[in-house]
């Protein structure tokens, strides 16, 4: 009885077949989106309504938008280049003249990079504070390092050695605090100075310095490139050929307190410019004469008569025209800026710039005057638009007893009424 086999009653049932999971049809051809109806497309993305014992509202189907990889989906421009960014046109200004006439200061003044006396003192004070912070930080690190080294080696030293180490640290701290603590100017000497006065502290140019400035003229941008050249002859031999290439304006700079620099413009600089200009670049170049340091008018050595005489002599001797004559001071920012703007406007009006916009043609003031003259020559007589007013003859209802009354209807004259 103990070995009797026991059986259990198991009901054999068919295995449950899982319901198919909903799968969204993958449409590879984008043209099928237009062919499929909205109802069928919405129902294809809906799960089985009886699956899981839940019923979903068919109106909540999620529609996938077609791919936006088609051309023109995002309004992109084609390869025609219509959406390319137009670069601003270039205007090259070349400043030449003797050394120490103020070419660098003029460029910095136009770019507003010269500091006033208050800004200069503030920058010096800030620089001194930064240096002092670095020195204090270095001193703290030195003291900490000494203490750590002493702590590591305290068993190797005696009390006399500790006293010696502390004396060395104090001596080093005193030297560091005293070092690099210069007096920032004499406050008594600068109490009466104007804090808004521009301080001109420039160094002699070695080679070439280039500054750029972007200007907007009638909603058109121009990239003004200012070339600052070295006045000393030893720095010019290697760079002369590349100076005058594609130059639009040559600014002859001189010092009104130095007659020698004024004569050099006639005897040296204008000759050098004409020798190195190519015939093509010379057609688009204009010459200007600028005198600097008019704030030192009491020390003037170059008079206005000398300037006018030199301009006439340049036109007769070299056959060039001086397009403008100016006098500026780098300490007066508005004067330098107005002078440079007048030079730039003159260049733009005469088409002396490198046009980077192919859609805009260069039109000079001479061309405009030529078209106006041609228009006036074609018209022999002026247009006289006169309008004559015609008066309608109204019949007079009054009767003049001194004249016979004409009967127009019967073509007869009646003496009386």
From Swiss-Prot:
List the protein's name. Answer: GTP-binding protein YPT11
Among SMART domains, the record links this protein to: RAB, RAS, RHO
Organism whose genome encodes this protein: Saccharomyces cerevisiae (strain YJM789)
**What is its quaternary makeup?**
Interacts with MYO2 (via C-terminal tail domain). Interacts with YIF1, YIP3, YIP4 and YIP5.
Query: Does the entry feature the keyword Electron transport, yes or no?
Result: no
Tell me which GO cellular component terms the UniProt record holds: cellular bud neck; cellular bud tip; endoplasmic reticulum membrane
Task: Extract the PANTHER family matched here.
Answer: RAS-RELATED PROTEIN RAB
Keywords assigned by UniProt, alphabetized: Endoplasmic reticulum, GTP-binding, Lipoprotein, Membrane, Nucleotide-binding, Prenylation
- Entry's localization field: Endoplasmic reticulum membrane; Bud tip; Bud neck
């Amino acid at each position: 009885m103990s070995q009797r086999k026991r059986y259990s009653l198991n009901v054999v049932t068919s295995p449950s077949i899982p319901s198919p999971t909903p799968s969204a049809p993958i449409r590879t051809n984008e043209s099928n989106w237009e062919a499929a109806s909205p109802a069928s497309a919405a129902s294809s993305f809906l799960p089985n309504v009886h699956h899981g014992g839940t019923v979903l509202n068919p109106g909540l189907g999620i529609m996938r938008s077609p791919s936006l990889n088609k051309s023109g989906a995002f309004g992109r421009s084609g390869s025609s280049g219509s959406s390319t960014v137009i670069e601003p046109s270039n205007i090259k200004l070349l400043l030449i003249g003797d050394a120490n006439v103020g070419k660098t200061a003029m460029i910095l003044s136009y770019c507003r990079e010269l500091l006033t006396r208050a800004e200069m003192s503030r920058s010096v004070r800030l620089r001194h504070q930064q240096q002092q912070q670095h020195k204090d930080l270095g001193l703290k690190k030195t003291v900490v390092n000494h203490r750590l080294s002493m702590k590591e080696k305290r068993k190797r030293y005696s009390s006399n050695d500790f006293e010696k180490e502390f004396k060395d640290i104090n001596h080093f701290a005193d030297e560091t605090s005293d070092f690099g603590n210069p007096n920032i100017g004499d406050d008594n000497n600068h109490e009466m100075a104007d804090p808004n006065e521009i301080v001109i502290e420039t160094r002699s140019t070695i080679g070439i310095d280039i500054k750029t400035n972007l200007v907007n003229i009638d909603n058109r941008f121009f990239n003004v490139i200012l070339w600052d050249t070295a006045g000393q002859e030893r720095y010019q031999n290697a760079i002369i050929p590349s100076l005058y290439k594609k130059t639009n304006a040559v600014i002859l700079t001189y010092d009104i307190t130095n007659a020698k620099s004024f004569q050099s413009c006639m005897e040296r600089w204008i000759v050098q410019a004409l020798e190195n200009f190519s015939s093509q670049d010379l057609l688009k170049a204009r010459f200007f004469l600028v005198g600097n340091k008019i704030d030192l008018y009491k020390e003037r050595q170059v008079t206005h008569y000398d300037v006018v005489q030199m301009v006439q002599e340049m036109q007769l001797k070299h056959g060039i025209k001086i397009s403008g004559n100016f006098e500026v001071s780098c300490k007066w920012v508005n004067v330098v800026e107005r002078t440079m703007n007048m030079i730039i406007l003159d260049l733009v009006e005469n088409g002396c710039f490198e046009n980077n916009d192919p859609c805009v043609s260069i039109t000079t003031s001479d061309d405009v005057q030529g078209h106006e003259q041609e228009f006036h020559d074609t018209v022999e007589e002026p247009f006289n638009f006169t309008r004559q007013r015609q008066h309608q003859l109204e019949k007079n209802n009054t009767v003049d007893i001194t004249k016979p009354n004409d009967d127009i209807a019967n073509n007869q004259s009646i003496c009386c009424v």
